[in-house]
């Protein structure tokens, strides 16, 4: 009797969580209220329905990515407000004369940086530079910021340390005595990055929005200003701080300082030296982004804690029968991860799917490395929503984007890159190697 009640309670929490997931999807797509409001309604609702404890529903406020966002908003604002972003942007545009050339250059630089730096950290340090380029060239920010964050995600698949999901998969493999080489992800990741760049400088270019009319008029990045009265030393300090922040992120493991801590050291140096005033530093923190991300983390947590994510994945896999073909299984795992990652975040999706994928590989006798590679690459396809990965959320307000802008540009990218990935995966990582 108690067992039946327990199962009913679990089913009830999963049903409620599914309801909140569907509500979020509909409201995000409809966008009649700001996305951050929808996200926070979900967080509050999950608390009121006892799906999550309040401390878990709002744990996002102390999440390392949120703390990184806040510090990088300040560093980015100082870099922009001192005029240094515009100067650097002017140098870059000497080599990239057209929007398509600029997009190609941005995606190459971002992708390669993401392979050695975290994809979120790479996007965070390059966003103010691209805003400066936008101001120098009058190219719309919305045309170049989406390719930036998408390239950051693709570049994360160039190495073991490029994205958190890669390390999660590595940890899972190590429990069964297997592992990936440092650059082994690049067998799939590098071709995908190349395909993504070609996509956006050709047919994908027309899918990028021109959202100048939608940009936040109160944002410092939307206001024309003169930098003549700003002391030159402030610009140089902002550049030096940005460079040292990047270096600290690159050598995070060696120096033992977390990304967000390095970013906050840089932000505090800028405030203490009065390169940026404390009031301007506070104003630069985009609360739309913070609240959207915090709310989406609550939903991701609920999907994981209630087993709803497991339920979705296992239900789909079970439909394949007892002896699924390797190709069908690979495609299904890839699609599940690609769908979940756009609503749970890429890190949460990988964390959810890694143990499931290992169990599947052991059940059918497949190479766990192959199954996990499909899992990680599918989980990196977080291009179709502003909540799929932290960088997507960071540029949402700055670029004046709507939810459907991500769908319009990101969904075709997922399809194109997904097709190439599914061709390459069985070549480099066959489920049943000879």
Regions found by a protein language model. Give the residues of each.
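Hydrophobic transmembrane alpha-helices of multi-pass small-molecule transporters
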Residues: 2-70, 74, 187-314, 330, ...
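Juxtamembrane and boundary regions of transmembrane helices in multi-pass small-molecule transporters
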Residues: 16, 137-150, 156-168, 172-228, ...
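Transmembrane alpha-helix interface/packing and boundary motifs in multi-pass membrane proteins
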Residues: 24-33, 109-118, 149-161, 248-254, ...
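Hydrophobic alpha-helical membrane segments of integral membrane proteins
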Residues: 37-42, 119-126, 146-147, 158-162, ...
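Residue-level recognition of transmembrane alpha-helices
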Residues: 39, 70, 107, 148-149, ...
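Membrane-embedded alpha-helical segments and adjacent helix-loop junctions characteristic
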Residues: 44, 48-140, 284-289, 293-364
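Alpha-helix N-cap/start motif
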Residues: 54, 100, 141, 182, ...
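Helix-coil boundary and interhelical linker segments in multi-pass alpha-helical membrane proteins
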Residues: 176-179, 358-369, 434
């Amino acid at each position: 009797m108690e067992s039946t009640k327990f199962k009913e309670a679990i089913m009830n929490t999963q049903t409620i969580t599914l309801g909140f997931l569907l509500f979020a999807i509909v409201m995000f797509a409809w966008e009649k209220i700001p996305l951050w409001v929808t996200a926070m309604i979900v967080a509050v609702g999950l608390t009121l329905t006892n799906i999550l404890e309040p401390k878990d529903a709002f744990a996002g406020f102390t999440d390392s990515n949120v703390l990184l966002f806040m510090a990088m908003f300040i560093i980015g604002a100082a870099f922009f407000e001192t005029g240094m972003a515009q100067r650097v942007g002017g140098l870059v545009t000497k080599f990239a004369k057209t929007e398509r050339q600029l997009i190609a250059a941005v995606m190459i630089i971002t992708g390669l940086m993401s392979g050695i730096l975290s994809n979120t950290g790479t996007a965070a340090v390059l966003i103010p530079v691209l805003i400066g380029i936008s101001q120098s060239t009058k190219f719309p920010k919305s045309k170049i910021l989406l390719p930036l964050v998408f390239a950051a995600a693709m570049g994360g698949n160039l190495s073991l340390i490029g994205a958190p999901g890669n390390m999660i998969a590595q940890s899972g493999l190590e429990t069964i005595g297997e592992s990936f080489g440092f650059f082994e992800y690049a067998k799939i990741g590098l071709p995908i990055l190349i395909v993504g760049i070609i996509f956006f400088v050709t047919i994908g270019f027309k899918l990028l929005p021109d959202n100048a009319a939608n940009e936040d008029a109160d944002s410092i990045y939307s206001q024309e200003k003169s930098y003549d009265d700003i002391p030159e030393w402030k610009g140089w300090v902002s550049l030096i701080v940005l460079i040292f922040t990047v270096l600290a992120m690159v050598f995070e493991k060696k120096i033992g300082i977390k990304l967000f801590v390095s970013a906050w050291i840089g932000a505090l140096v800028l405030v203490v030296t009065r390169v940026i005033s404390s009031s301007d530093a506070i104003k630069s923190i985009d609360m739309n982004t913070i609240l959207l991300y915090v709310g989406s983390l609550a939903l991701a947590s609920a999907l994981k804690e209630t087993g709803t994510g497991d339920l979705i994945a296992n239900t789909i896999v079970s439909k394949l029968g007892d002896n699924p073909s390797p190709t069908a299984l690979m495609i299904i795992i890839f699609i599940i991860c690609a769908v979940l990652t756009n609503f749970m975040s890429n890190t949460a999706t990988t964390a959810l799917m890694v143990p499931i994928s290992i169990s599947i590989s052991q059940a059918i006798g497949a190479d766990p490395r192959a199954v996990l590679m499909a899992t990680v690459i599918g989980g990196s396809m977080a291009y179709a929503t502003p909540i799929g990965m932290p960088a997507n959320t960071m540029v949402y307000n700055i670029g004046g984007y709507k939810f459907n802008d991500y769908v319009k540009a990101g969904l075709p990218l997922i399809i194109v890159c997904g097709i190439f990935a599914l061709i390459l995966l069985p070549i480099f990582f066959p489920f049943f190697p000879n």
